[in-house]
């Protein structure tokens, strides 16, 4: 971690680890599972043998609550909900199953429409094709 802080320093930035260090100190190293960057942690998917970088749950669950100005409110909300569900697919399958249903049900209740969403494995396949092929 200290090499990251040094590299940021050469660019005129001050790197602060997400834990804010102990007494302002940045640890020399940490396991990748202990690192968080821009609200993303790292987890290894043993079944697929790949690393994922899931966004923190609080951020994902906030996504449907916001809509950019200039967008149709329903279409903007739909896109945010679908993006939130895609982000959920980088978490464990049980997390995806639980929260994707909650989000889709809430959207359907509010609009009478359903989201265009993929399955857990479908999102994994999309990522594989996009990043590894």
Which role fits each region the language model picked out?
Residues 2-6, 10-14, 19, 24-133:
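Active-site and adjacent loop segments of nucleotide-processing enzymes
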């Amino acid at each position: 971690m200290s090499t990251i802080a040094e590299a940021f320093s050469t660019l005129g930035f001050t790197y602060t680890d997400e834990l804010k260090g102990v007494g302002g100190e940045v640890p020399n190293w940490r396991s990748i599972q202990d690192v968080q960057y821009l609200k993303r942690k790292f987890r290894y998917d043993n079944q697929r043998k790949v690393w994922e970088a899931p966004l923190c749950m609080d951020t994902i669950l906030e996504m449907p609550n916001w809509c950019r100005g200039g967008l149709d409110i329903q279409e903007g909300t739909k896109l945010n909900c679908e993006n939130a569900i895609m982000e959920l697919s980088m978490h464990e399958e049980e997390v995806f199953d639980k929260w994707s249903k909650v989000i889709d049900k809430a959207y359907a209740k509010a609009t009478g429409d359903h989201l265009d969403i993929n399955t857990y494995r479908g999102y994994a396949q999309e990522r594989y094709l996009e990043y590894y092929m």
